[in-house]
């Protein structure tokens, strides 16, 4: 059984927390995030620590307990440190460029694919084959990174495509010539 819900979240210095019932808001040096949580979990803030307690022992409440704790931990980390995803592009002629608020990808199609960058994200293209996506909301960063990767997922045969920098690809062998 998971014990995620019982973890105590430390609040770093320079981070402000405001709790109003089931509404949770956190402000830090990188920005602010707020979220409305379930009324079946109780969020407590004391001595620069946040703890989450469930109000009953029903199965849905137990499930929300750990989820709420993890979401709050991600919010606190996001406004203090931020989140970052790095992608790399492999393949001849595959490249990325920034054009205003759009990320343009040449990924082997007859046309370039243009993706609108969400307003709370920062996207950098240090080299045409590297993309760095950063922001304070872990969900938005991960969603946009998955959207970029989904334009041309890496091929298991050739390895060409867009992949996360730390992703290990499982390669397959090609067809054998018949005798």
Curated annotation (Swiss-Prot):
* Pfam families membership: Ribosomal_L6
From its record, what is one biological process in GO terms? cytoplasmic translation
Show the InterPro entries listed in the entry.
Answer: Ribosomal_uL6-like, Ribosomal_uL6-like_a/b-dom_sf, Ribosomal_uL6_a/b-dom, Ribosomal_uL6_bac-type
Q: Which domain of life is it from?
A: Bacteria
For whether the record's keyword set contains rRNA-binding, the answer is: yes
Extract one GO molecular function annotation from the record.
Answer: rRNA binding
The record's listing under Gene3D superfamilies reads:
Ribosomal protein L6, alpha-beta domain
Q: Keywords, A to Z?
A: Ribonucleoprotein, Ribosomal protein, RNA-binding, rRNA-binding
Q: Where is the signal peptide?
A: none
Q: Which GO terms describe its cellular component?
A: cytosolic large ribosomal subunit
NCBIfam families listed in its UniProt record: L6_bact (TIGR03654)
Complex and partners: Part of the 50S ribosomal subunit.
Give the protein family: Belongs to the universal ribosomal protein uL6 family.
Instruction: Tell me the PANTHER family matching this sequence.
Output: 60S/50S RIBOSOMAL PROTEIN L6/L9, LARGE RIBOSOMAL SUBUNIT PROTEIN UL6M
Q: So what does this one do?
A: This protein binds to the 23S rRNA, and is important in its secondary structure. It is located near the subunit interface in the base of the L7/L12 stalk, and near the tRNA binding site of the peptidyltransferase center.
Please state what the protein is called: Large ribosomal subunit protein uL6
Name of the gene encoding the protein in the UniProt record? rplF
